[in-house]
C-alpha cells in the first residue's frame, strides 16, 4: 500500500465532503495557499526513511492528488461480509452490524481516518488488518459497545486503539479538558505494552496519552501535574482507584472505556475494582469495549448488564487457542520426572530458545530458577515478589536475547507480547482452560508457528481435562495419548474444586546435583576421619 498516494487522496476526500465540486467559493480560494503549505508539511512529516526529496508541491501534482478518487471499500455487500467472516472463522451477533473492512485503506473512505494516524500505523509496520481488527474497528468507529473474543496474538490491542484514537483526534477539546479515554489492564506489564503501542500511533497528533505508572501517579497525587492534561490514561485498576478516591482523577468525562483481558478483570479479586471504576465513568454517551482471548458465560452476562446495543464478536472458538500452536501433553510420572523431562529436551535439541516456563506458585518458580541456573541454562525469573524495576529488567533481557528462558507464574500469562517465542512449557498444569489459553498464547503470535508442552503427573488427572478440551478444539489430536479420548468432561463441582484449591506438589529440589555430590563426599570424609580417630584411641 502506497502511503503517500493515500495521504494525498485524503485531501480530495475532505474537499468533496465540504463543498460543491463545481463551484469555488471565496473561502476556498483564500485558503488555497494554506492547503499547499499543509500538503508540503505532510510530505516532510511522512518521509520516514529520508528517501524522498522535500521539493515544492507543484500544481500538476496537487491537481492529480485532488482529482484522484479514493478507491471503494473492498467489502461493500452483506455477501462480501459473509464470505470474509467464513474465511476468518468469525461469528458476529447484534443489531444493525456494520460491514467489516477488507484493508486499512478502507478506513479512509468509511471512517475518514486521520492521515497522521494512518501514516503512523504504516510506519509502525502494520499493513493488513487481522480478523478481529476487520470487525472491531468499524463497529467501534460507529460508536457501538463491543464484547470481543479472539485468540492471543491476533491483534486485539490495535482493534480497540485505532477507533479510540481516531474518535478523540477528530473531535479535539480545549486544553486541560480532562480524561476522555481509559484503558484498564490487569497487570503492569500489559499496561506498559498497550502504552508502547498507542504512543507511536498518536505521534504528531493533538492527543496526549500516558501510562499511569508509579511515578506519574505520584506526581498527580502531589499535584505536581494535573490529570486533566491527559486525554488517554492506560492503567491497572488499583492505581486508578486510589487517585479517584483522592479526587485527583475525574472520570466523568470518559468517552471511551476499554477493559482488556475482561475475563480476568471480572473475576474474583478484580471484579470489585472494575465495578468501582465503572461507577465513576458516568458520561451517558460513554462507549465501552471488552476484549479477551477467553470470555466465560458469567463474564459475558456481567458485560451485557453494563452495555447498550452491543455487538458480540467471536474469532474462532470462544475459549480456543490459536491453531498456529502445536500443543502436547507429556506424562512425567512425578515431580522429579518434570526436571528429567526438561533435561531430556535439552539433550535432544527440543529446548529451542526463547522459551517461557509457567509454574503455579512463586516458591516453585524460585526453586526451578535456581535448579536451571545450576544446570548452566541462561534463565530469568518474574513473579509478584519482584519489584517493577526487576521485572522490567528481566523482560528487557529476555526480549534482547540476553536471557534464553523466562520462568514465571501466571502474572505474565496475559497480553504481554514477546516476538518469536518458540516454546511455552507448562511445568504445572493450569487450573482453568482460560489460564491455559492465555499461557500458551505467549507463542504462535501474529500467525507464526509455536509449540506448547504441558507436563502432568498422576495428581493432575482432573486438571488436564480442560487442557485436553482446548487441544481438541484446536485440532491438536496428535498431542495426547489415544486413551485420553475417552476421558469425560469435568463436572461443575470438579471445576470449582480445581479452581479454588491448588494441587499440593512436592518441593522442587533446589540443591544442584554437583552441590549434592560435594556435600555427600564431604560427609563421607568427615565420617571416615571420625572412624580413624576412634581406631587410634
From Swiss-Prot:
Residues 31-47, 523-537 have a biased composition (Basic and acidic residues). It is an enzyme of class 3 (hydrolase). GO terms for cellular component: cytosol; nucleolus. A motif (DEAD box) lies at residues 260-263. Its main location: nucleus. Residues 324-488 form the Helicase C-terminal domain. Residues 14-51, 512-537 are annotated as: Disordered. SUPFAM superfamilies: P-loop containing nucleoside triphosphate hydrolases (SSF52540). It comes from the Eukaryota. Residues 137-313 form the Helicase ATP-binding domain. It is found in: Nucleus, Nucleolus. Residues 15-30 have a biased composition (Polar residues). One of its GO terms (molecular function) is RNA binding. Signal peptide: none annotated. Pfam families: DEAD, Helicase_C. ATP-dependent RNA helicase involved in 40S ribosomal subunit biogenesis. Required for the processing and cleavage of 35S pre-rRNA at sites A0, A1, and A2, leading to mature 18S rRNA. This is ATP-dependent RNA helicase ROK1. It comes from Meyerozyma guilliermondii (strain ATCC 6260 / CBS 566 / DSM 6381 / JCM 1539 / NBRC 10279 / NRRL Y-324) (Yeast). The gene is ROK1.
Amino acid at each position: 500500500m502506497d502511503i503517500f498516494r493515500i495521504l494525498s487522496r485524503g485531501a480530495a476526500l475532505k474537499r468533496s465532503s465540504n463543498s460543491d465540486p463545481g463551484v469555488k467559493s471565496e473561502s476556498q480560494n483564500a485558503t488555497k495557499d494554506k492547503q499547499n503549505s499543509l500538503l508540503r508539511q505532510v510530505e516532510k512529516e511522512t518521509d520516514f526513511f529520508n528517501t524522498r526529496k522535500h521539493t515544492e508541491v507543484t500544481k500538476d501534482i496537487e491537481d492529480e492528488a485532488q482529482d484522484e478518487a479514493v478507491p471503494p471499500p473492498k467489502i461493500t455487500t452483506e455477501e462480501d461480509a459473509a464470505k470474509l467472516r467464513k474465511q476468518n472463522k468469525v461469528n458476529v451477533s447484534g443489531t444493525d452490524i456494520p460491514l467489516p473492512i477488507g484493508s486499512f485503506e478502507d478506513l479512509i473512505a468509511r471512517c475518514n481516518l486521520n492521515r497522521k494516524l494512518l501514516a503512523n500505523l504504516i510506519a509502525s509496520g502494520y499493513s493488513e488488518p487481522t480478523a478481529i481488527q476487520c470487525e472491531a474497528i468499524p463497529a467501534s468507529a460507529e460508536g457501538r459497545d463491543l464484547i470481543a473474543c479472539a485468540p492471543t496474538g491476533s491483534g486485539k490491542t490495535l482493534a480497540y486503539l485505532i477507533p479510540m484514537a481516531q474518535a478523540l483526534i477528530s473531535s479535539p477539546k480545549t486544553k486541560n479538558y480532562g480524561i476522555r479515554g481509559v484503558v484498564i489492564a490487569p497487570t503492569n506489564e500489559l499496561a506498559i505494552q498497550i502504552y508502547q503501542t498507542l504512543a507511536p500511533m498518536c505521534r504528531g497528533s493533538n492527543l496526549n496519552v500516558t501510562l499511569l505508572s508509579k511515578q506519574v501517579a505520584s506526581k498527580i497525587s502531589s499535584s505536581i501535574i494535573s490529570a486533566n492534561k491527559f486525554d488517554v490514561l492506560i492503567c491497572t485498576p488499583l492505581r486508578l482507584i486510589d487517585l479517584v478516591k483522592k479526587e485527583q482523577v475525574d472520570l466523568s468525562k470518559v468517552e471511551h472505556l476499554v477493559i482488556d483481558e475482561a475475563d480476568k478483570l471480572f473475576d474474583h479479586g478484580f471484579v470489585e475494582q472494575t465495578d468501582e471504576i465503572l461507577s465513576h465513568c458516568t458520561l451517558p454517551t460513554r462507549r465501552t469495549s471488552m476484549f479477551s482471548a477467553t470470555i466465560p458465560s458469567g463474564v459475558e452476562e456481567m458485560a451485557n448488564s453494563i452495555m447498550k446495543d452491543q455487538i458480540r464478536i467471536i474469532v474462532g472458538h470462544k475459549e480456543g487457542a490459536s491453531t498456529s500452536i502445536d500443543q502436547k501433553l507429556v506424562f512425567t510420572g512425578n515431580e522429579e520426572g518434570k526436571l528429567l523431562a526438561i533435561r531430556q529436551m535439552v539433550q535432544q535439541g527440543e529446548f529451542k530458545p526463547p522459551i517461557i516456563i509457567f509454574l503455579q506458585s512463586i516458591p516453585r518458580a524460585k526453586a526451578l530458577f535456581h535448579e536451571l541456573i545450576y544446570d548452566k541454562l541462561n534463565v530469568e525469573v518474574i513473579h509478584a515478589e519482584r519489584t517493577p524495576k526487576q521485572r522490567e529488567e528481566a523482560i528487557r533481557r529476555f526480549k534482547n536475547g540476553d536471557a534464553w528462558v523466562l520462568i514465571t507464574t501466571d502474572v505474565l500469562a496475559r497480553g504481554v507480547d514477546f516476538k518469536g517465542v518458540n516454546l511455552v512449557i507448562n511445568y504445572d498444569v493450569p487450573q482453568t482452560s482460560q489460564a491455559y489459553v492465555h499461557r500458551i498464547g505467549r507463542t504462535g503470535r501474529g500467525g507464526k508457528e509455536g509449540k506448547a508442552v504441558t507436563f502432568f503427573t498422576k495428581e493432575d488427572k482432573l486438571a488436564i481435562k480442560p487442557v485436553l478440551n482446548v487441544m481438541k478444539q484446536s485440532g491438536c489430536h496428535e498431542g495426547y495419548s489415544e486413551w485420553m479420548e475417552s476421558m469425560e468432561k469435568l463436572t461443575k463441582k470438579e471445576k470449582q474444586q480445581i479452581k479454588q484449591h491448588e494441587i499440593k506438589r512436592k518441593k522442587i529440589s533446589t540443591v544442584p546435583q554437583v552441590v549434592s555430590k560435594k556435600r555427600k563426599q564431604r560427609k563421607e570424609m568427615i565420617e571416615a576421619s571420625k572412624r580413624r580417630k576412634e581406631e587410634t584411641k
